[in-house]
Amino acid sequence: MKNGVKQISFLSLIGLSLIGLSLTNIAWAKVARPKNDTLTNTIQSAELKTSSFSSMPKKEIPNRHIISLSKSQLAQHPRLVLRGLILALYQNNTQAVQLLLPLYKQFPQHDNFLLTWAKAIDAREQGDLTQSIAYYRELFALDASLLPLRYQLAQALFFNYENESAKIQFEKLRTEVDDEKFLGVIDQYLLTLNQRNQWIWQVGLNFLNDDNLNNAPKSGTKIGSWTAWEKESGKGGRVFFISRKKWPWADHFFSKTMFNGNGKYYWDNKKYNEATLRIGGGLGYQTALVEVSLFPFQEKRWYAGGSSGTNTMKQYADKLGIRLENVDWLSKTWQISTALEYGESRYKIRKHLDGNYYFISSTLFYLPKSTQFWFVGMDFHRENTQALDNAYQQKTLRLGWGQDWSYGISSRLTFSYANRVYREKDLIGIQQKNREYATTITLWHRNIHFMGLTPKLSWDYQKSTSNHAFYRYDKNRIYLEIGKIF
């Protein structure tokens, strides 16, 4: 160093070449976004140390393209600093970001997006992963289309052991990467995530305001001398949780334990309070692209009894069954998820509902890009009960679309149509045949969180048409939902 001034091999440091680049083409707020950019560089393993965030190899630059500048000299070239910072951010180059950020801050004009991105990388390198992830989510609320940004967020989530969130980001990233070498890197991350043996939790809360809890038809509906029940309303909340843990074995095999639970509580109509808990465990096989599992389960349901019940929940029914699940990535943009379930039901009081059931579900997902998904699914459900007028067969078609928009807005739209046919006539002499429709629209902002919980606003509409007048109804509701995966 001459006169205490550090000399910087600038282009060597950030792995760039100025040959063929025109500095006059820099736009202050615009960043070029090639589909794969520098993501074709690879890492050796998904099991990286936390100090190796910027370990992706850079291309060798011939010596004739290296320019040595001091910091003071570099500070005289704001366009060069800007170009270097942008590419350092894209390349996930921590050393270059930490060098250029102080220089960039000295300039009279700053781009907040670039500053926040640089802060995210710096916080990550300092080991403050929680703050780094917060910065990345703030950036995602502004622009969810930048692939290097998604990769860096996925990395930070991975090293912070937010496994489920990291897996979602890597799977989205996989849909937009064409380079086979980098696809292999993503698959290594996914395989490592699948093999991690820690508990994963998903929790959520909905605020309920249902003006037709008992799915009553229009008031005054009659069939002969029979009169339909009247509507009942209720305000309250619904809570649900999913918890699971895997224990990896050799050769891609694993064992799994899972708990699912949900409950509804209406403070002004407690007769409709209910809760369900399912416990299961079994064996499975997984790679980065395929997961198959088979597990028996036991389920218990508590219910206050509905219109003829009390304000206290009591044990209502038990189920014992077995479930087979399969998830398979057919290609980088197509995934199929299938489930088969068989169970036997036993009711504490309503013995005429005892029996067994079969359930088959298959869903095909299409992810054309990381900010969008579509799905189509079909279900078959057969319920066999001792009283044949309660036994039925149902076929369901499901459609869905999810989208990350500009300005941090995300949306999800789902639609389903079901055809339900009962086996025998009821007491009135009608063999019930229903057509059931449901649609839900959900909106949320990607950068709005409260204690790690993301609020989502949903509108839900349900309609049932039937040859049985007592089972014709429609209702809609708007509710707030909050949830978290950790």
Swiss-Prot record:
Domain of life: Bacteria
Location of region: N-terminal domain: 30-197
Region (C-terminal probable beta barrel): 198-486
TM ranges: 199-209, 237-248, 253-262, 276-286, 290-300, 320-330, 334-344, 358-367, 373-382, 395-404, 409-419, 437-446, 453-463, 476-486
Signal peptide: 1-29
Listed GO CC annotations: cell outer membrane
Subcellular location: Cell outer membrane
Entry text on domains: Consists of a soluble N-terminal domain and C-terminal probable beta-barrel in the outer membrane with 14 predicted beta-strands.
Membrane topology label: Multi-pass membrane protein
A Pfam match: SlipAM
Primary localisation category: membrane
UniProt key word rRNA processing: no
Family label: Belongs to the Slam family.
InterPro entries per the UniProt record, alphabetical: Slam_C_b-barrel, TPR-like_helical_dom_sf
Functional note: Required for correct export to the cell surface of some cell outer membrane lipoproteins (tested with TpbP) upon heterologous expression in E.coli and probably also in Haemophilus.
Protein's name according to its UniProt entry: Surface lipoprotein assembly modifier
Keywords in alphabetical order: Cell outer membrane, Membrane, Signal, Transmembrane, Transmembrane beta strand
SUPFAM superfamilies: TPR-like
